[in-house]
A protein has these predicted regions:
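Phosphate/nucleotide-binding beta-alpha loop and adjacent structural elements of enzyme active sites
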Residues: 1-228
Length: 228
């Protein structure tokens, strides 16, 4: 084993990756590399080197991340209904709720392109009844937005990163990605919505503003994490 591999393995096993300068982390480590983990809650592709990511680590440890949210949802989700998962992250909750009752369809929304690709793979490998939306849920539909990409080299919890809109309209930038917004009220739902979860790190109010008609019509329970 050469000195390069010795140094690399040291930083991985000791979980000291975050101490390296960002440029070195990006160059030396393939931090976007995914690994398939077979767990008691399903099979999930997760970032292999995101060693400080709480959601990732809970899933790998055969746990349900935010188990109380899942347990609360199960009480309200009914057969033959739709569940809205706004801010689906890696998709564990979407996968589990799609299977908790008969004929449940989950509508999962995720804004980050990188996280969305992981979400899509996890839905597919678990054969879950989930409809995917790569959109920023808010109070407008089809509004073209530019947001800052997640700095995945920091190895923190992806779900704790706030969506940051930017006036820099350059999708070729290494730090910017383009995305279309969507409002819940503009989506056609062919059957009853029995539950809605919102976890979008500071964008919750915009989601609710764009869901007013749906909420008044459906009267579904909603659970969300509000941040000022």
């Amino acid at each position: 084993m050469n000195i390069f591999h010795i140094i690399k393995n040291f930083f991985i096993t000791k979980r000291y990756l975050y101490l390296l300068p960002r440029k070195i982390r990006l160059k030396i480590f393939n931090i976007k590399k995914l690994k398939l983990y077979k767990t008691k809650t399903g099979n999930y592709y997760l970032p292999q080197f995101a060693l400080k990511d709480l959601i990732r680590n809970e899933i790998i440890d055969n746990k349900i991340f935010d188990k109380k949210v899942y347990e609360t949802a199960v009480k309200y989700v009914k057969d033959d209904t739709i569940v809205l998962d706004v801010g689906a992250n890696f998709g564990q909750l979407s996968v589990l709720l799609s299977m908790c009752k008969k004929n449940v369809e989950v509508y999962s929304f995720e804004a980050s392109k990188y996280i969305f690709e992981i979400l899509k793979k996890n839905v597919q490998i678990n054969n879950a009844n989930v409809k995917l939306f790569h959109n920023l849920v808010g109070n407008e539909t089809e509004q073209e937005l530019f947001i800052k990409k997640l700095d995945i080299s920091k190895f923190n919890t992806y779900g704790s990163n706030m969506i940051e809109k930017t006036e820099i309209r350059n999708e070729n930038s290494a730090n910017i990605e383009k995305i279309n917004s969507i409002k819940i009220d503009d989506i056609f739902f062919g059957k009853k919505i029995s539950f809605m979860k919102i976890d979008v790190q500071g964008y919750d109010l915009e989601v609710l503003k764009g869901s007013k008609k749906t909420i008044l019509k459906q009267q579904m329970p909603i659970i969300f994490e509000y941040e000022e």
